[in-house]
Structures are given as structure tokens and as C-alpha cells.
Curated annotation (Swiss-Prot):
GO terms for molecular function: histidinol dehydrogenase activity; NAD binding; zinc ion binding. NAD(+) binds at Y137, Q198, N221. Pfam families: Histidinol_dh. GO terms for cellular component: cytosol. PROSITE patterns: HISOL_DEHYDROGENASE. It comes from Aromatoleum aromaticum (strain DSM 19018 / LMG 30748 / EbN1) (Azoarcus sp. (strain EbN1)). It is an enzyme of class 1 (oxidoreductase). InterPro entries: Ald_DH/histidinol_DH, Histidinol_DH_CS, Histidinol_DH_monofunct, Hstdl_DH. This is Histidinol dehydrogenase. Keywords: Amino-acid biosynthesis, Histidine biosynthesis, Metal-binding, NAD, Oxidoreductase, Zinc. The keyword Nucleotidyltransferase does not apply. Its EC number is 1.1.1.23.
């Protein structure tokens, strides 16, 4: 079989039209798909109306599982343990090491309640409370990712979520033991073998068997993403993620083959994934391009990689690392690699990135699985205003207001003036009724 061509655009940041070309390269519109929109709308309506019956029907239709009740689609704790026990020693150890590292990192994120007391006895504070119940969607079939279980379940558990319910499709009854083992290791409370928009609907609205959750997290296909988008407001969601992204900043000090493979690691996700190199050394860019040509034929997913690099990839020559950092902040990538011998001084120049991987040894793939920080990161330039998934996404904050009698005298007058200025007389009088000299 002929290997696919490894075409990837070459750009020069000194060209007058560079920024316009870059913005066009970055532009990604998922686009409204009328077929997906209509299908998801009908599925949500059916599940909301009939509950278990609709979920069973869609599971029969899409996953080819013909069961009589939702009880048959729930896995027991013993089944999860059996999946864990079925793994090789190496697989079990890898899952445990990764889980431990993710847990240690996320334990540092746990927010605590606080308060303070003013001179007149007024107490103000913030109460931090974990969510009661969270739903975790995990893809099934060919796209089975135990790492997604670790990255979503562990921060929820660290936050103290009361109940964590996982849904994972099992087409034709095929279960992925790594995914179920990850659920066992992380302490997922309940697991249902359902998927698609019907699983999102069941989590969002509740059914006769599956209770309504407060928030839904986890990746999925276009139907899952659209369902999450539609149920937002009824429940919380983590994000609606776009294609995976990596941006590598290099001064030519690394190994070209390493950089090429790091670009591949994103490109193999799908044809819309984005892999970009910013480099000050034109000769090194040539070496990376040559490495891409040399290494691509050996990759099992070479067709996907080639299409991704051709569609949305770029090798960009920049004048300086200062310019590279400015461009990086414009891109606001999901993953940013500082592939530099002396990377530390440049961390402070980066304002917008989901995660920064510092130095030649900090390969992004380690962050996907076992470094510790979360791999659920903002995409599509949303790192300008959003953050990685973390413990804080599974906690909520409540303000505590305890006004003393003395405090009510001072604050009551302030509130009265402002309320009357807004034309809200009941607000003003409510405050004034607490005043001693009213």
C-alpha cells in the first residue's frame, strides 16, 4: 500500500498576510448538522417523556443490546473488580500509578470554606460544598479511553461528590476491561452500559432507574456533544470540546524526530486535530519536515495523521522566541510544548494555554496519561478564558452573610439610599425597618 503524502503547510511570520493566514488556519466551526440536531432533539424528548423505555429502545437500536430492563444494563461492583483482575500485572500497575499521580495533584486543588468577622460583629464568608451527584460519560467501542475515567472521576472524588455515575456504551455487548478497571480503581459508584445522546438525556433528566445528576462531564462524539450542549442549564456540563490541539515552540535545540512525533501524537486523534510548530531555526524546520516524511509510513494511523497535518497543521518560521510567545498567546492552544534547552524563562511569557509542557523531556503524551494534571483542557482558543478540568469543577460556593445588629444600622442606610436610587421601594423599606431610628 502506498503511504499517504505528508503534506503540511509552511508559513513565515514575517509575511504581511501571516496573521490573516494564521487566523484562517485556526478557524474551526463545528457547523450545525441538521441531521444530528434533529436526531438529538428527538432522543432528548423521548427520554424525558418515557425514561427507561426510551433508553432501552435506543440502546437496542444503536448498540444492538436487546434487554428488558435498565437493571440488566447496570454493572455490579464485582464485575468491575473482575475487569481489574483480568488485566495483566503491567496494565494494573500502570493504571494504579497514573491514578495515584492524578489524585496527588488534584488534592492540592481542593478549596476550603472561609469566613471573617468585622469589628461590629458582622460575619461574612464562603461555604464550599461538593456536588451531590455527577454523571461521567465515557466513549465506548473503538474509542475506549480509560484515561478519561481517571481524569474525570478522580477530581470528582477528591472534591467529595456524593455519587458518581458512569455511562459507557458497549456495542454488541463488547465491554472494554481497561475502562471498567479504571472505574474500579477510581471508586465510581454506579456504571450503566448505555451511550449516545440517550445516556446524556438519562443523566440530565433522570429515569425510573437512573437518577438525575447535577453535572455531566466527559468526552463523546458529535451526538453526545450536541446533547450536552442542549441539556446545559438543566444540569451543568464541563465543556463542549473541539478537536485536539498542540503547539510546539522550538529554537532548534531539540531532536527533529521527537518534534515530528509530538505533532503526530495530536494528529492521530482525528483529521480535524491541529498540530503547529513555531521555530526560530529554518534549518530545523526542514529537519522536522524530513522527519515527518520519514516517520509517517510507520504509523498505524498514518492516513488520519496525514489528513490532519494537511488540513490544519503548519510549520511556521518566526524571528524570535518573543514573537513565538506572542503568536502562542494569540492561538491559546490546548497543549503548548516549550521544546527549548532553557525553557523556564519563557513560561512567564505564556498567558493563554490549557497546559504548558516545559523542556524537551516534558512530552505532551505523558500529560495525557500519568503526569498528574488533568488532560481535559480548553480547546478552540477558549484557553483565553477557561481552565483545565479540576476539583473546583465539582465544588460550588455559597456566600454566607450574617449581619450583626450594629452592622444593620450602617449597612441599612447604605442599602436604603441605593435601593431608592434604583426605584425599588420594598428593598429600601426592608432595610430601613431594621434601623433603630427609623
Amino acid at each position: 500500500m502506498t503511504a499517504p503524502a505528508a503534506a503540511i503547510r509552511r508559513l513565515d511570520a514575517r509575511e504581511p498576510e501571516f496573521l490573516a493566514t494564521l487566523d484562517a488556519l485556526l478557524a474551526f466551526e463545528g457547523g450545525a448538522d441538521a441531521r444530528i440536531d434533529a436526531a438529538v432533539s428527538e432522543i432528548l424528548r423521548a427520554v424525558r417523556t418515557t425514561g427507561d423505555a426510551a433508553v432501552l429502545e435506543y440502546t437496542r437500536r444503536f448498540d444492538h443490546l436487546d434487554v428488558k430492563s435498565m437493571v440488566q444494563l447496570e454493572l455490579s461492583k464485582s464485575e468491575l473488580k473482575a475487569a481489574l483482575d483480568s488485566l495483566t500485572v503491567e496494565q494494573r500497575e500502570a493504571l494504579r500509578v497514573a491514578a495515584d499521580r492524578v489524585r496527588v495533584y488534584h488534592e492540592r486543588q481542593r478549596a476550603e470554606s472561609w469566613d471573617y468577622v468585622e469589628a461590629d460583629g458582622t460575619r461574612l464568608g464562603q461555604k464550599v460544598t461538593p456536588l451531590d451527584r455527577v454523571g461521567l460519560y465515557v466513549p465506548g467501542g473503538r474509542a475506549s479511553y480509560p484515561s478519561s475515567v481517571l481524569m474525570n472521576a478522580i477530581p470528582a472524588k477528591v472534591a467529595g461528590v456524593g455519587e458518581l455515575i458512569m455511562v459507557v456504551p458497549t456495542p454488541n455487548g463488547e465491554k472494554n476491561p481497561l475502562v471498567l478497571a479504571a472505574a474500579a480503581i477510581t471508586g465510581v459508584d454506579r456504571v450503566f452500559t448505555i451511550g449516545g445522546a440517550q445516556a446524556v438525556a438519562a443523566l440530565a433528566y433522570g429515569t425510573q432507574t437512573l437518577p438525575q445528576v447535577d453535572k455531566i462531564v466527559g468526552p463523546g462524539n458529535a451526538y453526545v456533544a450536541e446533547a450536552k450542549r442542549r441539556v446545559f442549564g438543566t444540569v451543568g456540563i464541563d465543556m463542549v470540546a473541539g478537536p485536539s490541539e498542540v503547539l510546539i515552540i522550538s529554537d532548534g535545540s531539540g531532536q527533529a524526530g521527537w518534534v515530528a512525533m509530538d505533532l503526530f501524537a495530536q494528529a492521530e486523534h482525528d483529521e480535524l486535530a491541529q498540530s503547529i510548530l513555531l521555530c526560530t531555526d529554518a534549518g530545523f524546520i526542514d529537519a522536522v519536515a524530513a522527519s515527518i516524511e520519514r516517520l509517517l509510513p510507520s504509523m498505524p494511523r498514518r492516513e488520519t495523521i496525514a489528513a490532519s497535518l494537511a488540513n490544519r497543521g503548519a510549520l511556521i518560521h518566526v524571528d524570535s522566541l518573543e514573537q513565538a510567545c506572542a503568536i502562542a498567546n494569540r492561538i491559546a492552544p490546548e497543549h503548548l510544548e516549550l521544546s527549548l534547552d532553557d525553557a523556564e524563562p519563557w513560561i512567564g511569557r505564556i498567558r493563554h494555554a490549557g497546559a504548558i509542557f516545559v523542556g524537551h523531556w516534558s512530552v505532551e503524551a505523558l500529560g495525557d496519561y500519568c503526569a498528574g494534571p488533568n488532560h481535559v483542557l480548553p480547546t478552540m482558543r477558549s484557553a483565553r478564558f477557561s481552565s483545565p478540568l479540576g476539583v473546583y469543577d465539582f465544588q460550588k460556593r455559597t456566600s454566607i452573610v450574617q449581619i450583626s445588629e450594629a452592622g444593620a444600622q450602617t449597612l441599612g442606610r447604605v442599602a436604603s439610599i441605593l435601593a431608592r436610587g434604583e426605584g425599588l421601594q420594598a428593598h429600601a423599606r426592608s432595610a430601613e425597618m431594621r434601623l433603630h431610628d427609623r
